Every structure is written in C-alpha cells, then in structure tokens.
Amino acid sequence: MASEDQSAARSTGKVNWFNASKGYGFITPDDGSVELFVHQSSIVSEGYRSLTVGDAVEFAITQGSDGKTKAVNVTAPGGGSLKKENNSRGNGARRGGGGSGCYNCGELGHISKDCGIGGGGGGGERRSRGGEGCYNCGDTGHFARDCTSAGNGDQRGATKGGNDGCYTCGDVGHVARDCTQKSVGNGDQRGAVKGGNDGCYTCGDVGHFARDCTQKVAAGNVRSGGGGSGTCYSCGGVGHIARDCATKRQPSRGCYQCGGSGHLARDCDQRGSGGGGNDNACYKCGKEGHFARECSSVA
C-alpha cells in the first residue's frame, strides 16, 4: 500500500459482486459514484476474507499506481471487523459466500444449469449468464435434448430455417435414421428435393442403393444420367459391373507376333514370319526362334 495515495475520509456502500475463488469483487458507494474494485487482501475480517452481495461495508478509497481507484481497508459499518466463518456463509443468500452460489441468480443451493430464473438475478445481473434456455422452445429449466415441445411455429427450433428437421421427410421431432418414411418420394419431402442424387442409380427410386435394386433391367428403362458411368465395361449393360457380368467378351489383345488370338507372342510358333526382321532374333547369338534367356550358345 506504500505506493498508493490513501484518503483519510471513509465511505460507505454495499457489495455489488464478489467472487471468493478469484479473490476480488465490486462495491457500489452510497453516494452514487462509480463502483469500486475491492481485492480480498483489503478486507478486514475475523476469519475468512470474503464479502457477500448486499453486505453494507465501510471503506477508504485509494488510487493505485495504475491510476484507478479502488476500495481498501474494507470493514463493517463503524470500522469493526467483518465476521465471516467460511466462504459459503454470510448475511445474504444471493451470491452467498463469494462465488459458491448460482452464477445466474446468485442464490445458494443450486447451480446455474438448474436455475429456474432465466437471465435475472440479484445485484449483478449485468454479469448474469442469461440466454441459456432450451434451443428448441426457448424456455429455461431444461435442454433441447429433454424438450417435449417440437415443431410449433413460435418455438426457437422452428426459426432455424428448417435445419433441425428430418432430412428424409422434413418433419421435426426425429432424425433421418429414425424416419419411417424412407421410401416415400413425394415432392414435399426433403429427401425428394435433392436433385435426385440420393436415389438408386439403376431405377431412380429412393430408399435403396443400386446394389440392392430388384429391377435389373436392360438399358433404356433405367436411369442413365451419369453419362454411362453405371454400365458394365464388359457387355455394355446396366445394373451390374464387369466382374459380375455373365457375358464374357473375347479379349481384344492377341499375339503380338502373328496377330492371332489364344496365345501370347512368346508361345507363338510363327516367330520370324511376322515381318519383324531382326527385331525377333536372339540378342546373344543373332539367330531367330528363341530369346537370349533361352539361348544355349555360350559364345
């Protein structure tokens, strides 16, 4: 306190807010001047140094090195020591005992999530958390997951642009995985207005995938909006892929030696007759009819 200019005059006021766990609070002077910061170390108390919202106190005003005024030498009216047995008892029951009460209303006996007062609260309502009501109906006392009201026009859940409704049917109160209308494709349902991207690629209906489709029909009666991406590469049909195709096309790649099919160039008995010249000769001995790895010549 040596660096602070302390006034000899003392003032009176009431505690506006105090948090024992943080060790500071605010006092509102009786003369109507600006509220003053008070630190726990400035409290003169018999026992626990704490203040209770609504406590009448007497104090001196100082100006610290930071240029801000604050209350020091805080006592009971008349200059006596404050009597605080512990941090959860006191004269008032609003922010009882400096921070142990409800952060919403300041009362003891419950915490803010169980508070029945939405956004109200004792002398420190500017610090109250408020706005913690149900996101579905806007009421306090419960969360959206426990809300029994769903879908009314005046409810908060109905003002979110419909983002909380079921993605299949568009109704609220359930999610798509619990929807019983998975196979209905009416125009007023959300699942049917997605540009058809969620339907079966074989028949175009919604509610199942192409692999589960029972309408394995020929081309022309099926959806082909994918530019042929759903057709079989083997036979050109739709409804299956090449590995499941029952029609196996002859391989287009034949023998590189003679141009025939049914064998590879290394097994071709017409080596040398394909116009390859010396390209088909052994690199070791220069003779045709075999490769270097099969050559028996040691020269």
UniProtKB/Swiss-Prot annotation:
Zinc finger (CCHC-type): 100-117, 132-149, 164-181, 198-215, 230-247, 253-270, 280-297
Residues annotated with N-acetylalanine modification: 2
Record localization: Nucleus; Cytoplasm
Record GO biological process: cold acclimation; response to cold; response to salt stress; response to water deprivation
The UniProt record lists the keyword Kinase: no
Organs and tissues of expression: Mostly expressed in shoot apices and siliques, and, to a lower extent, in roots, cotyledons, stems, shoots, leaves, floral buds and flowers.
GO cellular component, one term: cytoplasm
Major location category of this protein: nucleus
Cross-referenced Pfam families: CSD, zf-CCHC
Occurrences of domain CSD (ranges): 12-76
Induction, per UniProt: Accumulates during cold acclimation, but down-regulated by dehydration and salt stresses.
PANTHER family for this protein: COLD SHOCK DOMAIN PROTEIN 2 (PTHR46565), COLD SHOCK DOMAIN-CONTAINING PROTEIN 3 (PTHR46565:SF23)
Family note: Belongs to the cold shock protein (CSP) family.
Protein's recorded name: Cold shock protein 1
Gene that this polypeptide is encoded by: CSP1
